[in-house]
Each structure stands twice: as structure tokens, then as C-alpha cells.
């Protein structure tokens, strides 16, 4: 593509800076790492790969990048798109072929949400492949808005305070998942994808289903953001500023042992001047 406009240049610098800060803050990538970048063909994973390739050039450490896409044998999946794009970039890549589509269609009744099962099957396959190629980190393209949405989904439907951590050791103990776009917002990623003209591959399984719980939460947050700009960022910051003593989880704070501090100095309160 040609020379970037002033706004495009600012956007690119902002995404690179925020991704770099997230990588540094959470020690996502270390010297000698082999980072498996999971590509779905969507705007988020393309942007993540683009940003990580830049960081690889400028970072004070050395690390490998291996791009991996999983062909789940969805009808109409354009198999040629990602190989052509990745060959042009000149980076190592693998296409993992596994027919999870048939499994999902067999197990999930028509009209029901397939996202959860599809995601679990894909994740398990990618964990196994990461182990096979000796990847030390597995990079996913989730961004700030995904993290906040997940926080509310868990609160509303699971009764738990958890989201998507920027860095996570998988349950198998053999994979470390990183989310380099954790500080980046979806609006910026969409704008970046538009001007970079990434060859987007739509998700035919889950993208066509209406009224998913995540979509409802997304629309709620978008409505809040329209009414009060900056609210999503404030919510995200709250996930980095947890105060266990002000919540009600007895596993995080010892409420049972909480007593008056007999050594504390007395404090005189002038009730007249209150």
C-alpha cells in the first residue's frame, strides 16, 4: 500500500504502542520464545500478526513467529486465502485441517448456538499442535472489548468475576496463552483492518446466528460508550485495580479474622462540625 495518511499513521503507532505495553506489562514474550500466532482470518488476528511482526523487528529480544490457521472444514471456507497471504508475507505458517464442523453440527441442534463447542474443539486442537511444534507461547487476537464483554458475560450468566487474562497458563500446564491486543480497542482494530485491506474470512458458523449472549452484552457496552465515552476503558482499568477487601470472596480476603486493631490511635471526630 502507499504512504499512510496522518490519521492512519497515528492509528498504527497507537496500536503498536499499546500492544508493546501489554507485552511488556505481562511479560508475554521472552527471549528465545517461539510464538504461535493463531489466525482465524478475522480483523483481530490479522492485526495481531501485523503488530507482532513489527515488534519482532524492533524488540530488544529475539523470538520466532509461526502463523497457524485451523481449517475446520466449514462449507465454503476459502482455503486459498490465508496461504496466499502468508506466503506473500514470507513467514512460516501451518494450516491445521480438522473437521470439527461435522462434530458441531451433529451435536448441536439446528438453531442453537454453536460458538462454545466450536471454540472448545478448536482450542484443544491448537493446544496439541502448539505442543507438537514446540511453541512456547500461543497468541490469540482478543482485544480490550472482548475482555470487558467476557467480564460481564461471566457476571451475568455464571455468577463469577472473571474475564480473559492477558496471559494465561492453560489447564494442561503445557501451553501459555497470550493476548497482545489486550490494551487495544475494537474500533481502532476495525479501522486498521479497513485501511490495511486484510483479506477477511467470515465465520459462517457463529457469525450468522442472532441474539447470542455476547452480542447482547456488546450492544449494551456500545450503548454505554455512546452515552458516556470512555466507560469501557474505565471498566477495563477496574480489572487491573482489584481490591479484595471491598468485595465478598472469602478465598481472596480473610474476613473471619478481621477485628478491631487495638494498637490503632484513637481518632477524635468533631460531630459539631460535620
Curated annotation (Swiss-Prot):
Motif (PP-loop motif): 40-45
Keyword Lipid biosynthesis: no
A GO MF term: tRNA binding
GO biological-process terms attached to the record: tRNA thio-modification
CDD domains per the UniProt record, alphabetical: TtcA-like (cd24138)
Co-factor: note: Binds 1 [4Fe-4S] cluster per subunit. The cluster is chelated by three Cys residues, the fourth Fe has a free coordination site that may bind a sulfur atom transferred from the persulfide of IscS.
Pfam family, one: ATP_bind_3
Principal cellular location given in the protein's record: cytoplasm
EC number: 2.8.1.-
Binding positions ([4Fe-4S] cluster): 115, 118, 206
An annotated GO cellular component: cytoplasm
Pathway membership: tRNA modification
Localization of this protein: Cytoplasm
Catalytic EC class: transferase
Keywords of this entry: 4Fe-4S, ATP-binding, Cytoplasm, Iron, Iron-sulfur, Magnesium, Metal-binding, Nucleotide-binding, RNA-binding, Transferase, tRNA processing, tRNA-binding
Record's catalysed reaction(s): cytidine(32) in tRNA + S-sulfanyl-L-cysteinyl-[cysteine desulfurase] + AH2 + ATP = 2-thiocytidine(32) in tRNA + L-cysteinyl-[cysteine desulfurase] + A + AMP + diphosphate + H(+)
Cofactor dependence: Mg(2+); [4Fe-4S] cluster
Subunit-structure text: Homodimer.
HAMAP family, alphabetized: TtcA
UniProt record similarity statement: Belongs to the TtcA family.
Record's miscellaneous remark: The thiolation reaction likely consists of two steps: a first activation step by ATP to form an adenylated intermediate of the target base of tRNA, and a second nucleophilic substitution step of the sulfur (S) atom supplied by the hydrosulfide attached to the Fe-S cluster.
Name under which the protein is recorded: tRNA-cytidine(32) 2-sulfurtransferase
The organism of origin for this protein: Pseudomonas fluorescens (strain Pf0-1)
